[in-house]
């Protein structure tokens, strides 16, 4: 589809996807893992990266279907935030929600099962828990990321496949509902 922004581009505008379906792609760990998600609208591209130490997009975004966007430059966002309390409150809520998500994901740092470790990696890379996850990664690389052997990761992925939680292809994992992956 049509590229909106690329991973690493400067985030100097609020970009609202008003209609259509947008895909995000994140490459991490020296491109050893690539996570693709689809998002329904309305959707705002990484508003938390408009300010702060890292003002670059974490993902690449492209339109999966025809749609429309609204782009508001940062200087206009600044003026709107100075003028309207509701804009300031919304930006504060977005930032706090992002921070709470990161804190909650890292709270239970010690995990026991391989499935929990896979869940943590996928959640850490995901922008939302709502959409299906398409993960391109070699089993050896995933094993290295979670500190497990390739054999143990293979067994767990096959178990997830047999339970209907994940679809496994060579170098690819598809998880339709990330909440199914989480251990109780």
Regions found by a protein language model. Name each.
Residues 3, 21-26, 44, 68-69:
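Short beta-strand segments in beta-sandwich/barrel cores
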């Amino acid at each position: 589809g049509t590229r909106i922004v690329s991973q690493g581009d400067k985030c100097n505008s609020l970009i609202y996807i008003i209609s259509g379906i947008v895909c995000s792609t994140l490459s991490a760990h020296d491109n050893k893992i690539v996570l693709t998600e689809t998002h329904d609208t309305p959707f705002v591209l990484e508003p938390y990266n408009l300010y702060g130490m890292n003002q670059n997009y974490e993902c690449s975004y492209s339109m999966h279907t025809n749609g429309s966007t609204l782009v508001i430059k940062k200087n206009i966002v600044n003026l709107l935030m100075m003028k309207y309390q509701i804009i300031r409150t919304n930006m504060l809520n977005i930032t706090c929600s992002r921070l709470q998500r990161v804190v909650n994901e890292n709270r239970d740092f010690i995990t026991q099962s391989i499935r929990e470790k896979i869940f943590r990696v996928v959640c850490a890379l995901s922008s939302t828990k709502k959409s299906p996850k398409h993960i391109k990664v070699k089993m050896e690389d995933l094993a290295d990321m979670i500190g497990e052997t390739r054999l143990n990761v293979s067994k767990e992925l096959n178990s997830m496949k047999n339970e209907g939680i994940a679809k496994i292809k060579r170098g690819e994992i598809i998880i339709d509902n990330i909440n199914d992956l989480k251990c109780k």
